[in-house]
A protein has these predicted regions:
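Hydrophobic faces of well-ordered beta-strands that scaffold small-molecule active sites
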Residues: 5-8, 79-81, 129-131, 201-203
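Active-site-adjacent "subsite" loops/lids of carbohydrate-active enzymes
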Residues: 3-74, 158-162
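Active-site-proximal loop/turn and secondary-structure-junction residues that shape catalytic pockets
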Residues: 9-15, 85, 133-137
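Short, well-ordered coil/turn segments that N-cap beta-strands
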Residues: 1-3, 75-77, 123-127
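Active-site groove signature of glycoside hydrolases
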Residues: 62-95
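Aromatic-lined substrate-binding rim segments of carbohydrate-active enzymes
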Residues: 1-6, 98-103
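Short low-complexity, flexible loop/linker segments enriched in glycine and/or proline
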Residues: 15, 19-30, 93-97, 143-147, ...
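Active-site-proximal substrate-binding groove within the catalytic cores of carbohydrate-active enzymes
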Residues: 60, 64, 107-306
Length: 314
């Protein structure tokens, strides 16, 4: 089917009731609070997990062995390592760990040592390492970063700060969690934003996008994927300069995201230094607008457009 399988593991949490925890003496790898207790987190599975210390030799060995097994024994396209570039460092007062007590740069260094070693040991040129979110200190460690925790409150207006700074040296996918239902305009808006900010598209459960009531969304996603392939040379290695709005198209209500123009735009500069304007009409209606050059164009419903257009940087 042409699908690339990248299994999930967690780079930070460990189930204390798991067999591996007992086998590897996982308690020795955990972050220890000042009072001697462990950090505990509970997610959707409702199973308590403890936070592992990235400087622990035990945790580094466990992560390395799991990545090696997945990448070689299963021959997958890579490994997705959750939470590493997402969660903030925890203080650790375990005197047996190879770091100063409390906080410090040892946290990031532990992860860097861990995954640099794992890559050299287990990941070939046709495989990737991916993680959640986009902490700066890990950009060079991962081939793909999943952007997923963007605030969805309607009174907020997220800005593409990370892509503006790092779009020419990082690859990322996603925009935010995709709420239900997806056929109320929110998925098309998220897809448009993702494309314009440089994200790889398609981060959604397959069952939701192939559902009978999501045919327009599936069509839009397919068109945007085809368009992204067309402008890949701009987005990969290029630099996002900022967003652009025509200012003459109607605003649309997006559940969970507030009001936004029916046509969204972004200014990019390719690796060759050429300026481009990308536009996406995520509405079911066509819209006329004026380009920065003064030229008038009409964008068809659920379509995208690109051209070499001088755009003043702001």
């Amino acid at each position: 089917m042409g699908a690339h399988v990248v299994p999930y593991i967690n780079g930070r949490l460990w189930d204390p009731l798991s067999e591996a925890f007992r086998t590897y003496h996982g308690d020795r790898a955990l972050c220890v609070k000042r009072d001697g207790s462990y950090y505990e987190e509970v997610y959707r599975s409702q199973v308590p997990h403890n936070v592992s210390c990235p400087s622990s030799e035990i945790w580094q060995r466990v992560q390395g062995d799991v990545i090696d097994s997945i990448s070689k024994r299963l021959s997958t396209a890579g490994v997705y390592i959750d939470q590493v570039a997402c969660a903030a460092p925890d203080l650790c007062y375990n005197p047996d760990h190879n770091h100063s007590l409390g906080g410090g740069n040892w946290w990031a260094k532990g992860y860097r040592d861990m995954y640099q070693t794992a890559r050299a040991r287990s990941i070939n040129d046709g495989q990737i390492l991916a993680t959640e979110e986009c902490a700066e200190c890990y950009i060079d460690l991962f081939d793909l970063m999943l952007i997923v925790n963007t605030d969805r409150r309607g009174d907020n207006r997220p800005i593409p700060l990370f892509p503006i700074v790092y779009s020419d040296r990082a690859l990322y996918t996603g925009y935010c969690y995709i709420a239900s239902p997806i056929n109320n305009g929110s998925f098309k808006f998220i897809t448009a934003k993702s494309l314009l900010w440089g994200s790889q598209l398609g981060w959604i459960q397959p069952g939701r996008i192939v559902a009978a009531d999501a045919q327009r969304e599936a069509l839009f996603l397919k068109r945007m994927q085809q368009f992204r392939a067309k402008v890949r040379s701009i987005l990969v290695g290029g630099q996002l300069l900022g967003e652009w709005s025509p200012g003459e198209v109607p605003l649309m209500d997006v559940p969970g995201h507030g009001q936004h123009p029916a046509v969204l735009g972004a200014k990019w500069r390719s690796a060759e230094g050429k300026p481009y304007l990308l536009l996406v009409n995520w509405d079911d209606q066509s819209h006329k607008l004026t380009l920065p050059t003064g030229k008038r164009i009409t964008l068809a419903p659920l379509s995208a457009w690109v051209d070499e257009v001088p755009c003043q940087e702001k």
